[in-house]
UniProtKB/Swiss-Prot annotation:
Organism encoding this protein: Bacillus cytotoxicus (strain DSM 22905 / CIP 110041 / 391-98 / NVH 391-98)
Cofactor binding summary note: Binds 2 [4Fe-4S] clusters. One cluster is coordinated with 3 cysteines and an exchangeable S-adenosyl-L-methionine.
NCBIfam families: miaB-methiolase, MiaB/RimO family radical SAM methylthiotransferase
CDD domains the record matches: Radical_SAM (cd01335)
Binding site for [4Fe-4S] cluster 2: 221, 225, 228
Protein's UniProt name: tRNA-2-methylthio-N(6)-dimethylallyladenosine synthase
Listed Polar residues bias regions: 1-15
């Protein structure tokens, strides 16, 4: 234990019970709860790009001899944020651990998209309380999207006083300072920025594996769908400069990565916030496809921003894969209007027709919400009919979950839960039917598979994914992990494929 840690331990043990504190004043000055009116007024002039992340000398060996544990909930953006926080911890001298019992710092990187996700976090905080009682020096933190909600932070203050720090999505780069404050503070350290932070380049990362990598290309969302909390928790759209993205992808390719996924809450709005150049996702993809890396994906896209130039570029193929995740949410134009999706059923179908014409072998997947306020049986049937017409390969399906502060949360939630569950069951039956039918076509085909590693269910079986994001299980030597191989599909299941290795690793050119 170093001197800073020893002093922190003395202070923590001197008063294990945290002083009660009024946080309402804090929120009046720093945090504003979700406001559609205020959020739509936000400009882009405050966002700056910082390219030199560095740590002052005071943080050298700050975490030496200590371990960190991060549990991640939610989307790929949260997964990537966890990689950044792990990179910062490592730079501070901390070591990772895979058990909470062995950790000196525990962070829960949270998701606010649905109530169920929040309930899981509060449940986990309850489970961590005995650890804190056993070891008062343990630091417990809550970060991510839930932390951007005032009601959530107030609940943590009132019911989970063993939490040492709370910070949001805009100030991850300040983790060293937050850790230091938490180590020396008797009260919970709360640092939540209601306004977006700068775009910080060159943040350290500890990537999960060396085969696939996430690459953030933009942050935030300006679409303001009535049900969605993301524009409030993640802020306005801010795009990274193309030269920084291209540099990062080239670096990943040089280090042997085979696949990258470009990330953004609304990834195909990339570049719309630039005021000094006309440059969009299609232009970026056209540059990236020239880099020597096997596969490039992106997620998640909004139909409203899926333009013809992007479709044209994706049609060039090469390392641009034939899989597009295109959330529709509902097949009813009336429902889409209430959701503020800003497109109609026919406009979505026309977009699908354009994509299929340019990329005939494309695989489309989607997101769908059932039980949105005022959804009628007829409108739900329109969703089922759209699914059949598009012939999606799979879908993420959800029962509507009200999010405090969003316009939809003020609507009367007038669909009985039993009706919501019945609709979800019917939709999932259709999803399963089409997934099984689509996968059946792969039987007898030879496909390219990027091998991720051992199957989760059987260590003697390897698992990987096709260009169209199909899970393939097959028997092969462990030496092919991380490689591209040819596999003949012998059996199709609803959500996966079984096959046989027919060729040694493919050389990527």
């Amino acid at each position: 234990m170093n001197e800073q840690q020893r002093l922190a331990s003395q202070q923590a043990n001197a008063s294990t019970k945290k002083e009660e504190k009024d946080y309402s004043k804090y929120f009046e000055h720093v945090y504003q709860p979700p406001s559609l009116k205020d959020a739509k007024k936000r400009g882009k002039e405050q966002v700056k790009i910082e390219r030199d992340f560095g740590l002052p000398e005071e943080f050298r060996n700050f975490g030496k001899g200590r371990k960190f544990y991060i549990r991640t909930y939610g989307c790929q953006m949260n997964e990537h944020d966890t990689e950044v926080m792990a990179g910062i911890f490592t730079t501070l001298g901390y070591e990772p651990t895979f058990t909470t019992e062995d950790a000196d710092v525990i962070l829960l990187n949270t998701c606010a998209i649905r109530e169920n996700a929040e309930n899981k976090v509060f449940g986990e905080l309850g489970h961590l309380k005995p650890l804190k009682q056993k070891n008062p020096d343990l630091l417990i933190g809550v970060c991510g999207c839930m932390s951007q909600e005032e009601s959530v932070v107030n609940k943590i203050m009132q019911k989970h006083q063993h939490v040492d720090m709370v910070f949001g999505t805009h100030n991850i780069h300040r983790l060293p300072y937050i850790l230091k404050d938490a180590m020396f503070s008797k009260a919970t350290v709360v640092e939540v920025w209601s306004k977006e932070g700068d775009v910080i380049e060159n943040l350290p990362k500890v990537r999960r594996g060396d085969i696939k990598a996430w690459v953030n290309i933009m942050y935030g969302c300006d679409k303001f769908c009535t049900y969605c909390i993301v524009p409030y928790t993640r802020g306005k759209e801010r795009s990274r400069r193309p030269e920084d993205i291209i540099k990062e992808v080239r670096h990943l390719a040089a280090n042997g990565y085979k696949e990258i996924t470009l990330l953004g809450q609304n990834v195909n709005a990339y570049g719309k916030d630039f005021d000094d150049l006309e440059y969009g996702l299609g232009d970026l993809m056209d540059e990236l496809r020239k880099i020597d890396i096997a596969r490039i994906r992106f997620t998640t896209s909004h139909p409203r921003d899926f333009d013809d130039h992007l479709i044209e570029v994706l049609g060039k193929g090469g390392n641009l894969v034939e899989h597009i995740h295109l959330p529709v949410q509902s097949g009813s134009t009336d429902m889409l209007k209430i959701m503020a999706r800003k497109y109609t059923r026919e406009q979505y179908l026309e977009l699908v027709r354009k994509i299929k014409k340019t990329i005939p072998n494309v695989v489309l997947t989607t997101d769908i919400i059932v039980g949105f306020p005022n959804e009628t049986d007829e409108q739900f049937e329109e969703t089922l009919s759209l699914y059949r017409e598009v012939e999606f390969d799979s879908a993420f399906t959800f029962i509507y979950s009200p999010r405090e502060g969003t316009p939809a949360a003020k609507m009367k939630d007038n669909i009985p839960m039993e009706v919501k569950k019945e609709r979800l069951q019917r939709l999932n039956e259709l999803v399963n039917e089409f997934s099984a039918k689509k996968n059946k076509k792969y039987e007898g085909q030879i496909v390219e598979v990027l091998v991720d590693g051992e199957s989760k269910n059987n260590p003697d079986v390897l698992a990987g994914y096709t260009r169209t994001n199909k899970l393939v299980n097959f028997v092969a030597p462990k030496s092919v992990i991380g490689q591209l191989v040819k596999v003949k599909i012998t059996e199709a299941k609803t959500w996966s494929l079984n096959g046989e290795l027919v060729e040694e690793p493919i050389e990527v050119k």
